[in-house]
Regions:
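Pair of pore-lining "gating" transmembrane helices in MFS-fold secondary transporters
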Residues: 2-19, 103-107
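Small-residue hotspots at the loop-to-helix junctions and early N-terminal turns
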Residues: 36-44, 132-133, 162
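Transmembrane alpha-helical segments of major facilitator superfamily
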Residues: 42-50, 139
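Helix-to-loop junctions at the C-terminal end of transmembrane segments
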Residues: 53-67
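C-terminal transmembrane helical hairpin of 12-TM major facilitator-type secondary transporters
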Residues: 68-115
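A late C-terminal transmembrane helix in Major Facilitator Superfamily
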Residues: 117-156, 164-165
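Multi-pass alpha-helical transporter architecture, strongest
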Residues: 167-187
Length: 187
């Protein structure tokens, strides 16, 4: 049960990124009329924050531990998801009202994934390769399903993407807090 909490935590956080990857070209290029040659710059903001967060995690995890870093990431994901839904629903902030919470969400996926994998490995020290392979397979499998679901109906606004990303962030946090037996704690 605890191991499944870590697996689902990592898989659902990654699935939020799959929702973004599937829907963002429509949202940015079609809905907000971003020129196609500028899409890469907006996409790159996600990678930039992901690099910064990954670097910070590599330094901070030694002092505060993987669980605390994971709990921090699992606080950011649902909050970014909630802000994303609010901005998409209320049309607050225009393009940047969508880009900023998406960057916050996607930028923290590597932190959640790495620290969730650390927690999972603690459950399977003798079969870490098998556990890691299963977790990776589920990340891509669930992500593919989420990517398909977010695009089943042609979107008319950023809201379907926002709902999918937020649901993945909340699901990731709930999987951890309900299945691992760890107490919820804001980092």
């Amino acid at each position: 049960r605890g191991a499944m909490g870590y697996v689902l935590c990592g898989a659902l956080s990654s699935s939020g990124m799959f929702a973004f990857l599937s829907a963002s070209p429509y949202v940015y290029i079609e809905y907000f009329k971003v020129p196609t040659e500028h899409y890469g710059w907006l996409f790159g903001l996600n990678i930039l924050l992901m690099m910064v967060v990954t670097f910070a995690n590599s330094r901070l995890v030694k002092g505060v531990g993987a669980e605390r870093m994971l709990q921090y990431g699992l606080t950011v994901l649902p909050l970014a998801g909630a802000l994303l839904i609010y901005n998409a629903w209320s049309q607050t902030g225009g393009l940047w009202g969508i880009v900023i919470p998406v960057v916050l969400f996607v930028g923290h996926i590597s932190l959640v994934g790495a620290n969730a994998m650390t927690g999972l490995m603690g459950h399977f020290p003798q079969s870490a390769g098998t556990a890691s392979a299963l977790a990776g397979t589920l990340r891509f499998g669930i992500g593919a399903v989420v990517g398909i679901l977010v695009n089943l109906n042609p979107p008319e606004s950023p809201l379907p993407m926002a709902i999918a990303i937020a649901a993945c962030g909340l699901g990731s946090a709930l999987s951890y807090w309900l299945l691992t037996g760890k107490r919820a704690r804001v980092a």
